[in-house]
Regions:
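Short conserved micro-motifs at the rims of enzyme active sites and ligand-binding pockets
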Residues: 9-11, 93-94, 306
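Outer membrane beta-barrel transmembrane domains
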Residues: 122, 159-162, 247-375
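Outer membrane beta-barrel translocator domains of Type V secretion systems
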Residues: 37-224, 229, 235-237, 325, ...
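Acidic, Ser/Thr-rich low-complexity linear motifs
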Residues: 235-248
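Ser/Thr- (and often Asn-) enriched beta-sheet segments in non-cytosolic proteins
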Residues: 12, 23-27, 35, 106, ...
Length: 375
């Protein structure tokens, strides 16, 4: 009528149509009417936005775990430590959003951390050390959809402040380390159709303990146990298809393992410099430097993970909530080496690898260099 038509190809969407958690297509039915229909799969932004909670909490845990309880060289003085760490982090495909698992992801991170002791004293047969640290870092993670296609990339700029309290029983060597940390996250999730930004706060508390045993004069074995509880709150926002809301995220971790390493006296001693004034502070050969090494295998169990992401529009009944699980078990191996290069300066390097063996726990690798200066 009046030149109108309903033939195939008469209508088409000029650009992808998204609303809430779905993509929509324009279809012509047998009755020659045209309808908007949602696709079976969720739009790519669903796994992309849900992974923001996981990425931020993974970073917070790695940052807190980069601090060794051994806050001084032989524990004799206050010290300042500068650490630089970088590595890979990600999660395997365990069924994705459709099965309630964390989306598959893979990316990198890096941070610079400055830490300093504020107080070191002896109390009732205990050595007590307190201090603070600050860190600035960045992570970038590529996220995949349930079908293995690219969902997008999440970038996070993070600034952190933390404090620690270390107690060591003087006679037995039994120690406990308490850490409290807060992080400000500024995140951007980019897909083919959207750029979504969210800011938020992450918090973390950790209690770690260990008891060293001497196997030989220079070899030590130290069983360790650590409990970590962390949380994250991200601001709600909106993208081109509707609102995006985040529920408070939290998760808990238990790490059980041991550290095996040398326990040599790190006294600098007299060097081989031909100048008398340098013999107590300079070495000519690397073989003369006091060195300790260590390896630390662990099992990490992640449990009680929570964190919702909701998407929808103003239309009634459009809201959908996704709660991917981060529970699982991973095996972790860290190894390190430290050398005293001056009377008051120690250099350390370490590397590690974590592998998920069940569930949606994180996996990745890391490398770190640390400069420790006592005063």
């Amino acid at each position: 009528q009046n030149g109108a038509t309903t033939e195939e190809g008469a209508f088409a969407l000029s650009r992808p149509l998204q609303a809430g958690a779905f993509n929509y297509t324009l279809n012509r039915d047998s009755d020659e009417d045209w309808y908007l229909r949602s696709e079976n799969a969720y739009r790519a932004e669903v796994p992309l936005y849900t992974s923001m909670l996981t990425q931020a909490m993974d970073y917070d845990r790695i940052l807190a775990g980069s601090r060794s309880h051994q806050t001084g060289v032989n524990g004799e003085n206050n010290s300042v430590r500068l650490s630089i760490q970088g590595g890979h982090l990600g999660h395997d495909n365990n069924g994705g959003i459709a099965r309630g698992a964390t989306p598959e992801s893979s990316g990198s991170y890096g941070f610079v951390r400055l830490e300093g002791d504020l107080l070191r004293t002896e109390v009732a047969g205990m050595s007590l050390t307190t201090g603070v640290y600050g860190a600035a870092g960045h992570s970038s993670v590529d996220v995949k959809d349930d079908d293995g296609s690219r969902a997008g990339t999440v970038r996070d700029d993070a600034g952190s402040l933390g404090g620690y309290l270390n107690l060591t029983h003087t006679s037995s060597g039994l120690w406990a380390d308490i850490v409290a940390q807060g992080t400000r996250h500024s995140m951007k999730a980019s897909s083919d159709n959207n750029d979504f930004r969210a800011r938020g706060w992450g918090w973390l508390g950790s209690l770690e303990t260990g008891l060293p045993f001497s196997i030989t004069d220079n070899l030590m074995l130290e069983p360790q146990l650590q409990y970590t509880w962390q949380g994250l709150s991200l601001d709600d926002g909106q993208d081109n298809a509707g609102y995006v809301k985040f529920g408070h995220g939290s998760t808990q971790h238990v790490r059980a393992g041991f550290r095996l390493g040398s326990h040599n006296d790190m006294t600098f001693g007299e060097g081989t410099s031909s100048r008398d004034t340098l013999r107590d502070s300079t070495k000519h050969r690397v073989s003369e430097l006091p060195v300790n090494w260590w390896v630390q295998p662990s099992v990490i169990r992640t449990f009680s993970s929570r964190g919702d992401m909701s998407m929808g529009t103003a239309a009634a009944g459009s809201n959908m909530t996704f709660s991917p699980s981060r529970n699982g078990t991973s095996l972790d191996l860290q190894a390190g080496l430290e050398a005293r290069v001056r009377e008051n300066i120690t250099l350390g390097v370490q590397a590690g690898y974590a592998h998920s063996v069940s569930g949606s726990s994180a996996e990745g690798c890391n490398g770190q260099a640390t400069l420790n200066v006592t005063f």
